[in-house]
Amino acid sequence: MSAPAPVVVTGLGIVAPNGTGTEEYWAATLAGKSGIDVIQRFDPHGYPVRVGGEVLAFDAAAHLPGRLLPQTDRMTQHALVAAEWALADAGLEPEKQDEYGLGVLTAAGAGGFEFGQREMQKLWGTGPERVSAYQSFAWFYAVNTGQISIRHGMRGHSSVFVTEQAGGLDAAAHAARLLRKGTLNTALTGGCEASLCPWGLVAQIPSGFLSEATDPHDAYLPFDARAAGYVPGEGGAMLVAERADSARERDAATVYGRIAGHASTFDARPGTGRPTGPARAIRLALEEARVAPEDVDVVYADAAGVPALDRAEAEALAEVFGPGAVPVTAPKTMTGRLYAGGAALDVATALLSIRDCVVPPTVGTGAPAPGLGIDLVLHQPRELRVDTALVVARGMGGFNSALVVRRHG
């Protein structure tokens, strides 16, 4: 069987707690600069979780038309700006393309929590006549896909994936499939989240997975014996994907890499005795990419920061690759877990690793907990030629996804 038409990534747009814009984020990440701190956009002291990864340097009014500001939640503002930056990076002008060949495929784990909280407070505080008409869509988990497609006149196949942290991988993979089939010529794909408001935080706390540490430096320690949960964050990334022949024909300035393989699985119900965790998704993604385990240069881990989940992920990696056989990193220790935005940001970061032949560090974690058997890139970047990177993401409730990106050409 012939190999499928390669799909490449030609544009990146990043909005993250430790940097807005691709190069600012990448420089901060390589320097080990964290965007995790005590939450500042509201007073968190009445809550058990007080630390988060906020995008404090982001000013939506500096990037978006004034008419969009009152109708969009913060997560949508992040997504709109990241999409615009990705298109500019790719050198693509949507208005000059076939509008039905342009699609938007995003991931979402929640919706417009901050916008929704504000309007609910109006409803119960001053009456329904004060509630914004924009509430009808600003809260909706699919709104980022809609707003991006409207803003850029992208009328082709569009969708949204709601698989929590795994969603960014699932959206990118589906975009690649549509491009290979010829359903789309160009796709904007990725995810952005922004649920760091009182209502959003309270909705997350019952999971029991959030860190209650008050020191930002010790709050998120995946694979460490001291791990006690993850730090919630906001932001994400958008990517421009297209077929390699299309990128070549238009003489794209940059090809970051290609989307080579993907798989998703779902954990069995507890008590069935069937295996859980991401090992099967990893194997299937490698199979689709036609990559042997020994050819993977780095793994971008899900890194839940929850001891049982960390151990399950480490065991899955050891099962597929062998103990300590492949470098593993978790730069999300500098941003917090961004839910649907997190996996998209990991894909962008993996592509930057391929471009610059360097693996960013995991910060905070002192050393892997005894018995995990992983080669964790700690404290400093590791110079390494990266031709193949694997990104792993797990969503709450049993979602497992894995995506392989490779150097192109």
Swiss-Prot record:
SUPFAM superfamilies per the UniProt record, alphabetical: Thiolase-like
One GO MF term: 3-oxoacyl-[acyl-carrier-protein] synthase activity
Enzyme Commission code(s) on record: 2.3.1.235
Catalytic reaction list: 10 malonyl-CoA + 8 H(+) = tetracenomycin F2 + 10 CO2 + 10 CoA + 2 H2O
Pathway the protein contributes to: Antibiotic biosynthesis; tetracenomycin C biosynthesis
Top enzyme class: transferase
Record GO biological process: antibiotic biosynthetic process; fatty acid biosynthetic process
CDD domains in the record: CLF
Entry-linked Gene3D superfamilies: 3.40.47.10
Domain of life assignment: Bacteria
Protein family (similarity comment): Belongs to the thiolase-like superfamily. Beta-ketoacyl-ACP synthases family.
Miscellaneous remark of the record: This putative ketoacyl synthase lacks the active site cysteine.
The protein, known as: Tetracenomycin polyketide synthase ketoacyl synthase beta subunit
